[in-house]
Regions:
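Central antiparallel beta-sheet cores of small beta-barrel/beta-sandwich binding domains
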Residues: 1-77, 85-104
């Protein structure tokens, strides 16, 4: 499994601009994702599919905030750094900037 651990990055959207924390964990052999956005209650994330391609993870997830809508995530890891983006229905592409591993 790629990218397990806690990560942080900067995002800029019409709803939030600042640092976001992402926890990627092993959920009984499946990928699990938790996102922490200051001041915003992020609903639970249901993982629909995950594909690994070399150093890149492509995932499709859903949340109760957008029922029945797929959120696509692509993250490419390079040791303790990453870049990537989310494609969120009705919002569009949200880029991860300055992605880096943070202390456990």
């Amino acid at each position: 499994m790629l990218g397990l651990g806690k990560w942080a990055c900067n995002v800029n959207t019409m709803f939030f601009s600042g640092e976001v924390k992402i926890n990627i964990f092993d959920n009984n052999g499946e990928y699990g994702f938790e996102i922490d956005i200051p001041g915003i209650q992020v609903p639970d994330i249901t993982v629909k599919s995950v594909e690994e391609d070399d150093d890149t993870v492509n995932a499709v997830v859903q949340t109760s905030l957008l029922p029945g809508k797929d959120i696509e995530m692509t993250v490419t890891f390079d040791e303790d750094e990453f870049d990537g983006f989310l494609k969120i229905p009705f919002i569009g592409k949200v880029k991860f900037k300055d992605g880096h591993r943070i202390a456990e």
